[in-house]
A protein has these predicted regions:
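Short alpha-helical scaffolding segments that buttress acidic/His motifs in well-ordered protein cores
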Residues: 25, 47-51, 188
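C-terminal helix-cap and adjacent tail motif
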Residues: 2-13, 17, 187-242
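Glycine/small-residue-rich phosphate/adenosyl-binding loop
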Residues: 61-143
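A glycine-rich helix N-cap at a beta->alpha junction
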Residues: 85-94, 177-200
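Short secondary-structure boundary segments
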Residues: 120, 166, 192
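Glycine-rich phosphate/pyrophosphate-binding beta-alpha loops
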Residues: 53-58
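Small-aliphatic-rich amphipathic alpha-helix that forms the alpha element of a beta-alpha
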Residues: 47, 51-52, 116, 124-175
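Short acidic N-proximal helix/loop "leader" segments that mark the beginning
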Residues: 1-46
Length: 242
């Protein structure tokens, strides 16, 4: 019991430490503009260690990280992006919005000093992974948690990450020689950013606005508001405290 209490005390974070975490979450951005400076290996290893400490279903740890440095390979992936991106632009019916879409920089494949493909080995731990059978995609969700850990750690190191989703992931998997049963989850550009925006780029340019949290919280069933957990109610309770 004493050892357990000591452990709990060690896990108590100061107000300053808590604020650092929240600041990281609020300031994280999807980066597209990169400086060419390489990431020091010891820094990159720390970032990947953070990813590797993510929670995973049944402690499956389904992730792998393919570091892509080959200019030829990255040029092939850039060509895939350009093909898909042109098709996506044509899907935007409104002409002014299509023009806005075409003006956006949505990748840093060649500019960033490193690309990383994050994969999910869906065979790992087979034939039985504790907790996965009822929801088979929990291995994919686990890999996404590793990506979030990686992103926040990178942000803490002053490093930017950009997730490139405008790709044919099946073609990328073949380019990377990935075996059957291993799925590409994220293709990331990573490096020191030329800038950190105050707000997400898509919010700044007017593509989308951040939704109000109050409208996203329900109680007991879909669509039923949770009046006691709104900004207004919490602020009112704080003001009433002596």
């Amino acid at each position: 019991m004493t050892e357990r209490l000591v452990d709990l005390m060690d896990r108590t974070f100061s107000a300053t430490e808590r604020e650092v975490i929240y600041r990281l979450i609020r300031s994280r951005r999807d980066i597209r503009q990169f400086a060419p400076d390489p990431i020091p290996p010891e820094t990159l290893l720390r970032v990947l260690e953070a990813a590797h400490h993510a929670p995973s279903v049944g402690f499956m740890q389904p992730w792998n990280f393919i570091l892509i440095t080959s200019p030829r390979l990255r040029a092939q992936i850039k060509a895939l992006f350009e093909e898909i991106n042109e098709g996506e632009a044509h899907r935007v019916a409104d002409q002014s919005r299509q023009q806005l879409y075409r003006s956006l920089k949505l990748e840093g494949l060649m500019e960033s000093p490193l690309n990383i493909a994050v994969t999910c080995d869906r065979r790992r731990g087979a034939p039985f992974v504790l907790g996965r059978t009822p929801v088979p995609d929990t291995d994919v969700y686990s890999t996404c948690l590793a990506i979030q850990n990686m992103w926040l750690a990178a942000c803490a190191e002053g490093i930017g990450i950009g997730w490139v989703s405008i790709l044919d992931y099946g073609k990328v998997e073949r380019l990377l020689g990935m075996p059957a049963g291993v799925q590409l989850i994220a293709y990331l550009c990573i490096g020191f950013p030329r800038e950190f925006r105050a707000r997400p780029m898509l919010e700044e340019v007017g593509w989308r606005s951040r939704m109000q949290l109050d409208g996203l919280i329900f109680q007991d069933c879909w669509g039923q508001p949770c009046p006691w957990l709104s900004r207004e109610s919490v602020a009112s309770d704080e003001n009433e405290q002596p």
